[in-house]
Structures are given as C-alpha cells and as structure tokens.
C-alpha cells in the first residue's frame, strides 16, 4: 500500500456533525474520491477512521510492514492531546501531512495547539474536504520523487 489515510475521533459523523465547520460530505464521499485519484496515478490507497487512539497507533505501527510510503492524518481531537500518536509517527519514520477540515487557528484557543504540526511535511487546515485532495497531491509528489531516486 502506498498511501495511508487515518481519521481520528468523530470523523465518522461527517455530513451530519456541525456542517458549518465540517461541511456536508460524508467520510465515505471523501475517501471514495481520494481512492479514485490515487488509483488514477497507479497508487494504492487505504483509509481507516477510528475513535480509539490505540487502534490508530496500531495502524501507524503496521504501516512500515504494509509498504506505506506516505501517511495523511486528520487526528481530529487527538491533535491537541495525543503525544502517543505523535510518537508513533516519529517511530515509523514515514513522511506525513496533517489535515483539518476546519481552520483550527480560527477556532477555540485549545484547538490551536497541535502535537503534529512541527513534525509534519505540511499542514492543510480550513479547506474542507478539498484539504484531503491537497494532501494526497503532496503524497503523490513525495512518492514520485522517491521513485526517481
């Protein structure tokens, strides 16, 4: 698998949860579109959403054995709380992008702290579902550069 997308807590409720912040597309809508984009350029794409920090960590730990070359993660509420997820990403050494549907810097003060931003290749925040597409384009470019080496 080339690209792994991980989504944190409550993102399974996309489409109905606070549409003013998160839009009306469901997570299935978003991941179906991303799968098509990845497949069109010959990459494999897998996605998981979980409300459990431990399960997200397990997906990260398994990423190396699964041949993952790039991770896209929307840690959701774990953005502001999870040193464990941060450490898991550092442990596997796979490049990643951090994505947020809403602009976390235009929201409550507690949402402005990210445990991922300083170690991510990039942060995409506030562009709604299109932010995932931007992150996938970054992943595609990263993988293509690796293949040229």
From Swiss-Prot:
Site, as annotated: Transition state stabilizer: 17
EC primary class: lyase
Molecular-function GO term, any one: 3-dehydroquinate dehydratase activity
Binding site for substrate: 74, 80, 87, 101-102, 111
Pathway of action: Metabolic intermediate biosynthesis; chorismate biosynthesis; chorismate from D-erythrose 4-phosphate and phosphoenolpyruvate: step 3/7
Catalytic activity: 3-dehydroquinate = 3-dehydroshikimate + H2O
Record-linked InterPro entries: DHquinase_II, DHquinase_II_CS, DHquinase_II_sf
Nucleus keyword on record: no
Active site: 22 (proton acceptor), 100 (proton donor)
Role of this protein: Catalyzes a trans-dehydration via an enolate intermediate.
Matches recorded under HAMAP family: AroQ
NCBIfam families membership: aroQ, PRK05395.1-1, PRK05395.1-2, PRK05395.1-3, PRK05395.1-4
Family of the protein in this entry: Belongs to the type-II 3-dehydroquinase family.
Subunit structure: Homododecamer.
Official protein name in the record: 3-dehydroquinate dehydratase
UniProt lineage: Bacteria, Pseudomonadati, Pseudomonadota, Gammaproteobacteria, Candidatus Pseudothioglobaceae
Gene: aroQ
């Amino acid at each position: 698998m080339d690209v792994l997308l991980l989504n944190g807590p409550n993102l399974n409720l996309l489409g109905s949860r606070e549409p003013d912040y998160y839009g009306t597309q469901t997570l299935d809508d978003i991941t179906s579109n991303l799968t098509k984009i990845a497949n069109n350029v010959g990459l494999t794409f897998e996605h998981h959403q979980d409300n459990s920090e431990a399960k997200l960590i397990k997906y990260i730990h398994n990423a190396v054995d699964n041949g993952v070359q790039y991770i896209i993660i929307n840690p959701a509420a774990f953005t502001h709380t999870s040193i464990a997820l941060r450490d898991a990403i550092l442990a596997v050494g796979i490049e990643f992008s951090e994505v947020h549907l809403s602009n976390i810097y235009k929201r409550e003060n507690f949402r402005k702290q990210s445990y991922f931003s300083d170690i991510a290749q990039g942060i995409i925040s506030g562009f709604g579902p299109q932010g995932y597409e931007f992150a996938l384009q970054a992943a595609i470019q990263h993988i293509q550069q690796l293949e040229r080496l």
